[in-house]
């Protein structure tokens, strides 16, 4: 079951932040900084709950198993509304049961319901498992962000 997250889910959501750096990170990025930045961003959105942010929790066997954070924003290039998958994580205990896939299907349905013209996400190059999942669901490079540590 996928449901809208409530403030009672905040600690669970924040408890999955470490998942976003459990793979090789690009040069110049370290786990501590990445985790801290993502935690700050999630805390901000969870605290303020802006109208453009939507959090969902997936439940399996009565237990919270993962979450997804969607943001509705204007597409810079074609002025249409897009839905950005800002965060998507499944707990280690629930990996391999198709929950990430179910969250992706839910994100697409949500985006269509809200009249979005595009569904986007960002992923670190080293997160190969997620990249394979996203490719299976039709995600392909839209705009590459390149970086150079200074």
Regions flagged by a language model, labelled:
Residues 101, 113, 125-143:
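Conserved active-site alpha-helix within GNAT-family acetyltransferase domains
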Residues 1-15, 26:
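A short beta-loop-alpha structural element at the N-terminal edge
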Residues 104, 111-122:
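Conserved GNAT acetyl-CoA-binding A-motif
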């Amino acid at each position: 079951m996928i449901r809208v997250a409530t403030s009672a889910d905040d600690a669970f959501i924040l408890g999955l932040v470490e998942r976003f750096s459990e793979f090789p990170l690009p040069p110049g990025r370290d786990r501590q900084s990445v985790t801290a930045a993502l935690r700050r961003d999630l805390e901000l959105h969870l605290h303020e709950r802006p109208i453009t942010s939507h959090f969902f929790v997936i439940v399996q066997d009565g237990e919270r198993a993962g979450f997804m954070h969607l943001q509705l924003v204007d597409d810079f290039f074609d002025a249409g509304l897009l839905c950005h998958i800002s965060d998507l994580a499944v707990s280690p205990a629930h990996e391999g049961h198709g929950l990430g896939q179910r969250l992706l299907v839910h994100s697409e349905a949500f985006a269509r319901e809200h009249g979005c013209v595009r569904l986007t996400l960002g992923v670190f190059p080293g997160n190969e498992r997620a990249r394979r999942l996203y490719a299976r669901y039709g995600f392909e490079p839209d705009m590459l962000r390149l970086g150079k540590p200074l």
